Curated annotation (Swiss-Prot):
Belongs to the oxidoreductase OpS7 family. This is Oxidoreductase OpS7. Keywords: Oxidoreductase, Virulence. Pathway: Secondary metabolite biosynthesis. Oxidoreductase; part of the gene cluster that mediates the biosynthesis of the bibenzoquinone oosporein, a metabolite required for fungal virulence that acts by evading host immunity to facilitate fungal multiplication in insects. The non-reducing polyketide synthase OpS1 produces orsellinic acid by condensing acetyl-CoA with 3 malonyl-CoA units. Orsellinic acid is then hydroxylated to benzenetriol by the hydroxylase OpS4. The intermediate is oxidized either nonenzymatically to 5,5'-dideoxy-oosporein or enzymatically to benzenetetrol by the oxidoreductase OpS7. Its EC number is 1.-.-.-. It is an enzyme of class 1 (oxidoreductase). It comes from Beauveria bassiana (strain ARSEF 2860). Gene3D superfamilies: Jelly Rolls.
Length: 305
């Protein structure tokens, strides 16, 4: 059996998680983008970093360019192992498709080349925006992916101790979001070669574990408990046999609660008594009387004919 969601978060906007430490506001995507969000990260108590989600693991997108803009505070943007600290005055940071990257909320001060107001920035909330281009593919970084990835990580950390790796790969596969192969190449290998090799291997590891192995074991990238636009999520998963086999669509035939309440009953107690309204279990006389009355009525009907 695959992963089973616990949290019900479909339709929530903003999406509030980790006891209010993170808010994700889904905004109307600008033309040509697959999504746009504004996230608010509340400051953590000193030393309270464990268990709080403060940024994704290193990853890459094959078909989408991602953009970041800080509204308040500062955020570290790591691209191919190089970290840049982004502030409101710095405008938009762009990460082209194919690059290994992540954003870092609690960025290490050693990466900051412009350290003014460090203490004030560290103590305040962080607000920043993210969007990505729309590649037109079935599996893209969009609201459906974000709702499910955020749902998986909350259920994993709140009700467990770690994220199911197969589920992580399946969800990442559904969002053009792949885990790079570990950086094990010698330092003399050019960065461009290293990125190309790590992304090639990382893509296939993510797809093989998430889609092929996970799909056969009952995993899927998206779950109804997390997903606002479930019909689109189903359409995405039906594009590959490995996920399609785990998706069922009987819910489309369901009658709404309003219609159920307004339905006229098509049966009554008489149906349970086979039309003998006066019949009582164990009351033979009443049954005989009901049968005789019915026979008499049938006789009258024949005379009338």
């Amino acid at each position: 059996m695959g992963f089973v969601p616990i949290t019900l978060s479909a339709g929530q906007n903003p999406l509030t998680q980790f006891d209010g430490k993170i808010e994700t506001h889904f905004l109307e995507p600008p033309a040509g983008t697959a999504f746009q969000i504004m996230q608010i990260y509340k400051p953590l108590p000193k030393g309270d970093k464990s268990g709080a989600y403060r940024g994704p693991p290193p990853h890459f997108h094959l078909h989408q360019t991602e953009r970041f803009k800080v509204i308040k505070g500062r955020v570290g943007i790591e691209v191919n192992d190089k970290v840049t600290v982004l502030r409101p005055k710095d405008g938009v940071a762009i990460c082209p498709a194919g690059n290994i990257h992540r954003f870092i909320i609690d960025v290490d001060p050693k990466h900051d080349q412009d350290g003014e107001d460090d203490e004030e920035e560290d103590d305040g909330e962080i607000v920043f925006m993210v969007n990505a281009t729309d590649s037109g593919k079935d599996f893209v970084l969009d609201r459906i992916f974000l709702e499910n990835w955020y749902g998986v990580r909350v259920d994993s950390f709140k009700y467990g101790t770690k994220i199911d790796f197969i589920q992580q790969c399946a969800t990442f596969d559904g969002g053009d979001h792949y885990l790079p192969f570990p950086a094990t190449l010698p330092e003399w290998v050019p960065m461009s070669w290293s990125v190309a090799i790590r992304t090639f291997l990382g893509f296939w590891v993510t797809v093989i574990i998430g889609r092929y192995v996970g799909g056969l074991l009952g995993y899927q990238p998206f779950y109804r408990e997390y997903t606002t636009d479930w019909e689109l999520a189903v359409a995405k998963m039906q594009g590959t046999w490995f996920y399609r086999r785990n998706v069922q669509t009987a819910y489309r035939a369901a009658t709404s609660w309003k219609e159920l309440r307004e339905m006229v009953p098509y049966s009554d107690e008489g149906a349970a008594n086979m039309g003998l309204a006066d019949a009582k279990v164990g009351n033979g006389a009443a049954v005989k009387k009901a049968i005789n009355d019915r026979a008499a009525n049938n006789g009258e009907d024949k005379k009338n004919l």
